[in-house]
Amino acid sequence: KNVDKKDYDSRFNNTCNQRVNIDLISEDIKSSYEKLYNNLNTFEGKMSLDKIKDTDYYKEFVTKMLYRYRASVYDKNAEDPYCWMSYLLKNYKSEEVYDFCKKAFAKMKKEKIRVEEFLSPDIKSKAGRVSIKYFVGIRVLDEMVDLYRSFGENGIDCYIVSASFIDIVRAFATDKDNNYRMDKKKVLGLRLMKDDAGRILPKFDRNFPITIREGKVQTINEFIKNDRNYGPIMVGGDSDGDFEMLTFFDETEIALIINSENTGSIESLRKKAIEGYSRFYLQERNVNEGRFVSLEKS
């Protein structure tokens, strides 16, 4: 839902150099998932997860889900164009999202940081064989933890305003094992509707702004600012989705750009930071070690 139907960029051609699109890849994902569902012992089958992992349909499902996430772009003409990734969580409850996210975070923190290539098996499929490279590993940034704590100790409230689905961000930011230990109420993000049973629906909750670009400014103005406080004295971000938040508020003394080398409008702010503008600062990082560094290039 809400994914552009046109062929993917040629960078994502299959191994036979043929174009692929969301309809083709979705058929393969559906087919492999049905096999997983019918064979995995936690669903309708008798096979353990360890044995399932050796099957072609497991490898097909994992590779093409990762490929779908990386290759797909949102449909700019859709009603809620940005939300398509979160729609994958349809029918989950918040507690279930929290649970599997925390398990995933715990596992990824133990993984060696690396770039891994996934290749789908040589089986009959609609999209053909595809490969995709993925960054594996997640780390708690000690420098960021120290910053949050220092602010808190000096009476400065810290908030997270993320473009990601709110339940996923809260699962990470509030987890005691991740050291951030944020107050759940101070972690804001994309919100979806839920049914009467609390299950997530693939529909944006219009009681809240979409937390990207201008929507992040709206979120701060509507849900953080009040008669007893004012705009943020410091804002951090790394992409175009943060541009308005980094530039909008007159009260902001420090706009910290985390250098992830994303392209777009954020490049102009990186340039200002390098040129020495008093408001903008560039923070480099060592992605291989999961930490911030005092260098001119990440």
Segments (PLM) and residue ranges:
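C-terminal cap/substrate-recognition subdomain and adjoining C-terminal extension
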Residues: 75-76, 92-298
